């Protein structure tokens, strides 16, 4: 690992001292920071709920803003060096405006309240009562996942939900460390990274970038919340460039470490890199033999998203496969992985009748587990799906045909209008997480072009595969092009999926520049 990556890893892991208790003489900012709340009065702050004035104009808006300033001290007070809100009233808003910053603060709230931190006047780094239960009737509201996410980002986008639950119990102080450079935003809650460089969307005008500057705002929403030790470090252009470069290097290093297989299809069917066997195989009777291009699976030089590609010109039975050993890492205790590929086809014009599975993960018996991407056979346009089928009695206790099971009773994600075409490549990523795990909930996620499409959750995902028989299979009844296949040994995060989607030269960027083909 390079020195810059090591230094950035240390930087991410360390949360320099924010005072654990109120200190005599007021807040004491760490080196390079300044206090934006003096612990004594409301100097430097005013009241503003931007939502209440957003649609007003002229004198009505002027009167509203004036009234909010007047109402501010009615709902905010100073107590023991803490800035305290009663749960209502306008938001505490800094007179000063900020651009690229690192913000550190502490907060403590009560049950059934929520709040948030607006950056550049834009919502928000979310604060939840994380004890609230998930309501399936409001699926985009997920307080049970914890605080720190960019709640006003588009549902399913990177950073909207926190990566881990990091909240402390009620009655204890929580510590936020928030860094924002441009729209890229990192959030640490209680020293845990919950948002990793995600882009904060402009809630007010989503088609435009985040404003260059704006105030910091502390939201009021339904219950008392206390704030203390609010410190800001303003990040200059040179420092911002250094941080972004180090973050990019660190992100690629994490992905490189997780990579287990990469097949660029630039020279043929075999993988360029593998922790296990690079050879691509095909089933002949009971044997696996080395796969070679033929009339059913052609090598198409310069036809790929990055260089060459595989072309499946017609529905066939020749299915290139990669062995698991060291690649997928299937095991009977707790299995997680991610698979990435690019596809190009028009499903409604190119595919022949019947189901089509461009990628499968299979074992010794499909009734003991079966994972696949598929296009449906009867709908127009065809639905695109990602399915994880565990042991047969779990998902199909009534022994029905797959097509006869109601869609909401299938362990799958379905996309009615997926963005596939002959003219453009579509990036597909699917993850498996905690398969066979008896303690942690299993999850499977589907992403298209870097965006989350849905998740398979609340299923018993017990498999019964023989690990020695597990295969990654390509092109079952598939007609179209495929490029840049990759496997990772863990579920990628939303932001990591977005990153590999944006790689200019494909997965090879994760390893070739530093270590050569492995």
Task: Please describe what each predicted stretch is.
Residues 279-287:
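Low-complexity, Gly/Ser/Thr/Pro- and Asn/Asp-enriched, turn/coil-prone segments
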Residues 8-19:
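Bacterial N-terminal signal peptides
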Residues 22-251, 257-261, 271-274, 286-288, ...:
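Carbohydrate-interacting regions of secretory-pathway proteins
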Residues 1-7:
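Positively charged n-region of N-terminal signal peptides that target proteins for export
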Residues 441-444, 483:
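Repetitive beta-architecture junctions, highlighting loop-to-beta-strand starts
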């Amino acid at each position: 690992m390079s020195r810059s990556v090591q230094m950035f890893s240390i930087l991410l892991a360390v949360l320099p001292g924010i005072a654990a208790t109120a200190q005599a003489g007021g807040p004491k900012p760490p080196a390079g920071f300044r206090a934006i709340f003096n612990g004594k009065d409301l100097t430097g702050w005013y009241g503003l709920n931007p939502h209440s004035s957003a649609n007003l104009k002229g004198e009505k808006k002027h009167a509203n803003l004036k009234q909010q300033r007047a109402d501010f001290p009615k709902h905010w007070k100073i107590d023991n060096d803490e800035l305290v809100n009663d749960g209502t009233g306008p938001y505490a808003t800094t007179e000063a405006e900020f651009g690229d910053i690192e913000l550190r603060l502490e907060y403590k709230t009560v049950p059934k309240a929520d709040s948030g931190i607006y950056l550049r006047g834009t919502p928000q780094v979310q604060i939840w009562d994380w004890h609230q239960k998930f309501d399936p009737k409001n699926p985009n509201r997920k307080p049970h996942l914890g605080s720190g996410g960019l709640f006003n980002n588009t549902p399913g986008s990177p950073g909207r939900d926190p990566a881990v639950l990091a909240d402390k119990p009620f009655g204890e102080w929580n510590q936020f460390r928030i860094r924002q450079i441009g729209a890229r935003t990192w959030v640490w809650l209680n020293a845990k990274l919950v948002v990793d460089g995600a882009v904060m969307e402009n809630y007010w005008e989503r088609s435009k970038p985040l404003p260059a500057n704006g105030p910091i705002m502390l939201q009021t929403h339904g219950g008392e919340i206390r704030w203390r030790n609010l410190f800001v470090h303003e990040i200059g252009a040179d420092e911002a460039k250094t941080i972004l470069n180090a973050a990019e290097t660190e992100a690629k290093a994490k992905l490189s470490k997780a990579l287990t297989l990469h097949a660029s299809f630039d020279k043929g069917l075999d993988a360029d890199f593998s922790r296990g066997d690079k050879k691509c195989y095909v089933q002949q009777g009971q044997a696996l033999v080395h796969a070679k291009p033929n009339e059913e699976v052609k090598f198409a030089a310069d036809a790929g998203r990055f260089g060459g590609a595989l072309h499946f010109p017609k529905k066939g039975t020749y299915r290139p496969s990669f062995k698991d050993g060291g690649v997928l890492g299937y095991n009977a205790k707790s299995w997680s992985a991610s698979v990435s590929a690019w596809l190009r086809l028009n499903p409604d014009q190119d595919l022949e009748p019947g189901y089509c599975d461009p990628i499968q993960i299979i074992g010794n018996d499909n009734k003991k587990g079966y994972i696949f991407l598929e296009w449906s056979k009867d709908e127009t346009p065809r639905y695109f799906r990602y399915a994880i089928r565990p042991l047969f009695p779990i998902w199909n206790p009534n022994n029905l045909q797959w097509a006869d099971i109601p869609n909401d009773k299938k362990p799958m994600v379905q996309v009615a209008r997926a963005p596939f075409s002959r003219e453009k490549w579509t990036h597909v990523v699917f993850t498996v997480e905690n398969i066979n795990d008896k303690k942690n909930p299993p999850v499977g996620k589907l992403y298209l072009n870097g965006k989350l499409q849905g998740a398979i959750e609340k299923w018993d995902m017990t498999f019964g595969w023989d690990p020695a028989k597990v295969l990654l299979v390509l092109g079952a009844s598939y007609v179209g092009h495929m490029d840049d296949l990759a496997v990772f040994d863990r579920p990628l995060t939303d932001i990591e999926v977005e990153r590999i989607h944006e790689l200019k030269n494909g997965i090879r960027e994760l390893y070739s520049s530093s270590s050569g083909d492995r």
